[in-house]
Amino acid sequence: MKKEHSSRWRKLDNAAQAFPAATGKKDTRVFRFYCQLKEDIQADLLQKALEQTMEHYPVFSMVLRKGLFWFYLEQRDLPAKVEEEKRPPCSEIYVPDHKTLLFQVSYYKTRINFEVFHALTDGTGAMLFLKELVSNYLILRHPEETFSKVREDMLTETDFEEDSFSQYYTGKKNEKEKSRPAYQIKGEYLEQEEMEITEILLSAEAVHKCAKAHGVSVTAYLAAALVYAVYEEIPKSRLKKPVSLMVPANLRNFFPSASMTNFWSWIEIACCLLYTSPSPRDRSLSR
């Protein structure tokens, strides 16, 4: 039986509400995950794998619409098409008044790219989708092999589309702490089409080992490295302002949720640093 999705709609979750109004040519609010394989991608098999994946995650069949007072997501029977990569990474996906899907699957040589407009999902939801997409592709590409399951069969469509913000929101307001104005990085702000990309490949095992040696998580270690990198660029005469970093936190680590919609929040880190001549051990952090 064919599923009827055309009349289904839902409000944007709490974290997604800011994205539609803030998106534009200078900030597309698109992020990318990719998977690098060891052989060239076969486009026809990737297309079939995408269609199989979409059957299990109808939340990705939604388009963004603008109502009288707010934006909302509406489910549409639009085909998702795989394309060979041609545009710069994280190019614009959401175009106002255009009924288009809010993600794009592309490929380049041995790489499968998955780009998504942030109003649709967060990093956790996007990673689950990409994992199943790659799994379906490998099963089609190598039917003689056995692959482990990515998705839990017990989870339902309702679980994936749950607005966990509404479910766990208590209405309790915490007292806000006053924050000092942070140091602003200087430099030329490039248009999206002129974006410069620096790609760095790190050994996950090596990074985890470094983080463990410092007694912190990988997230904390990388955040500290980024703060230190900013610190090194600050003129010593302007060290009075703190270096601030906004780190996204996956709320699924604190509340039970299988939702593939946005369920995250920010943690603000502010570091007031004094200039000292760094020792070789200190500089190892930036490596």
Language-model regions: role of each:
Residues 2-14, 120-128, 132-209, 242:
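Non-catalytic, low-complexity flexible loops and terminal extensions
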Residues 1-69, 78-104, 208, 232-277, ...:
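Acyl-thioester-dependent acyl-group transfer interface
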Residues 38-57, 115-131, 197-235:
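Acyl activation and transfer enzymes in specialized metabolism, enriched
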Residues 112, 219, 243:
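Alpha-helical scaffolds flanking conserved acidic
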Residues 30-32, 111, 197:
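Intrinsic-disorder/low-complexity, polar/charged segments enriched in Ser/Thr/Lys/Arg/Asp/Glu/Gln
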Residues 69-71, 112:
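Hydrophobic residues embedded in beta-strands of well-ordered beta-sheets
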Residues 278-282:
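Short, small-residue-biased leader/transition segments that mark boundaries at the very start
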